[in-house]
């Protein structure tokens, strides 16, 4: 599972996920990519599940580039614990996703196979996505 090796602070405030993705919004490494069209959170488990789905579909051909990393800790309090008494323990890690963010890229595979792999991976994600190709300028 993906998570940072070390962080400056153990717990972070909730914050708000607003705006559009400007960084990480273009296809940079591969030839075809999957892009988020809605905002949301992607847990480390979801990143890994989608990665496994893509790699199983494209088998040994091609290379997968993961463009997201879960760097935000999410805390939860145990069941049946009264309110107050501080913030809960870190339970899992998420990546805040804004519309327009590239999630995965594939290179070295024909576009039809990559599209099939991305459609299977999109079913594992908690927001709507679209498939985009690299534009050569």
Curated annotation (Swiss-Prot):
CDD domains: Ribosomal_L16_L10e. The gene is rplP. The keyword Nuclease does not apply. Keywords: Ribonucleoprotein, Ribosomal protein, RNA-binding, rRNA-binding, tRNA-binding. Pfam families: Ribosomal_L16. One of its GO terms (molecular function) is rRNA binding. It comes from the Bacteria. One of its GO terms (cellular component) is cytosolic large ribosomal subunit. NCBIfam families: rplP_bact (TIGR01164). It comes from Acinetobacter baylyi (strain ATCC 33305 / BD413 / ADP1). PROSITE patterns: RIBOSOMAL_L16_2. GO terms for biological process: translation. Binds 23S rRNA and is also seen to make contacts with the A and possibly P site tRNAs. Part of the 50S ribosomal subunit. The keyword Methyltransferase does not apply. This is Large ribosomal subunit protein uL16. Belongs to the universal ribosomal protein uL16 family. InterPro entries: Ribosomal_uL16, Ribosomal_uL16_bact-type, Ribosomal_uL16_CS, Ribosomal_uL16_dom, Ribosomal_uL16_sf.
């Amino acid at each position: 599972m993906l998570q940072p090796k070390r962080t400056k602070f153990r717990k972070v405030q909730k914050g708000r996920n607003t705006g559009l993705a400007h960084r990480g919004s273009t296809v940079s490494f591969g030839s075809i990519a999957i892009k988020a069209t809605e905002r949301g959170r992607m847990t480390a488990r979801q990143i890994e599940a989608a990665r496994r789905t893509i790699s199983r579909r494209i088998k040994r051909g091609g290379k997968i580039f993961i463009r997201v990393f879960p760097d935000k800790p999410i805390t939860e309090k145990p069941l049946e614990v009264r309110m107050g008494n501080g913030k809960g323990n870190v339970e899992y890690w998420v990546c805040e996703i804004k519309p327009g963010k590239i999630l995965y890229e594939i290179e070295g595979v024909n576009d039809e196979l990559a599209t099939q792999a991305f459609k299977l991976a999109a079913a594992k994600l908690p927001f709507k996505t679209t498939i985009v190709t690299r534009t050569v300028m």
